[in-house]
Amino acid sequence: MEETKELFRALEFAHYAERFRDSIFVIALPAGAPFSDLLLDFKVLAGYRIRVVLVTSDPDFQIEQVISQANQRGSRFLLSLLTDLLFRPEEELLNLDFQRVATSLEQGRMPVIAYHGAEAVSAAHPIDPTYRLGAQVALRLGAQKLFLVGRLAATLRSALPRSSVQASELEGLPDRLAATGLPQAVPLCTFIAAQLALGIPDVVLLEGRSGHLFREVFTYDGAGILFTATRASRIRRAGMRDVTDMTLLLRPEVESGAILPVLESRIEANIDNYWIYEIDGMPVGLAGLKRYGEYAELAQFATLPRYRGRGRARELAQFLVEQARAQGFRFVFALSIDPRMWEFFQYLGFQPIDREELPADWRGGYDLSRPSRALLKEL
């Protein structure tokens, strides 16, 4: 079992490395952020051809020395110092040679945009100037993600119901944060909403701890808070190109014991039974619809952890119930060992039923020693 987990982790890593290959990520590190602690994260991203631009404050003139030492160990940082930069919106980028930045990215180097002088964060200027500069750099370069590194990430992540927030959900978030004792997060959330509206696809709030950037980029669970532009969603049939995504989506359910292990070859052989919930081209949920005579089974529900809690599994289940009805089935049924799923299906109108009443061809292939409950809905 441990070997299987290791293989899943390797598959997950390889999957995301390929997905983000040649993407541009801008990482904003305010004064006091542990630049040295993140060097290994930066090196891993760059090693898998993710193009990284670092924007950081260097009030103590330490960055140049850190970068020099890192480059001696094989890193490929390229330092651009913006000395005594005045952070007025119309002047922030006057001293920055974007052609040099773009060229260095094409050469596989990591540009570091560092400055020495800026006004302090205050009531009049509540957003760290590093974040403001990082956002403008991200917009100018067409970055896929803007990472805002800071201490507030851990507090805010524990206060939010999930680790992903869509732009449409940001409208009421400042009031909720103020009411829950986090007024300091309100200006930042307003700033993030503005950057999404301007065209940055993803903004990530992240703690400056070693390994957190790696986890955010290369794992399904992530490590920070992902703020995304509101994107188009749809339900579609699964195809062979989805098999790796489907395997990784099912992994947490398999590891918890909620779903029996499923080989990729088994998924491929039954690919026509599966449906995908997709957001902006990325599979975030799946379920299967299997035929047993006049019965159809809803099976193998899985949702990407940070996309749960928004009714997507319910929407997918209702869609599949209608598919079963349109295909002429008389009944749909589902089984689970998870009490939350029992409630889920009962909410959709399913009623408990003895497993012995289910089709004989289904019973012949099921391990009845599993402590699952069956639920049925007549169409």
Predicted regions and their residues:
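Conserved catalytic-core motifs of GNAT/GCN5-like acyltransferases
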Residues: 333-335, 346, 351-370
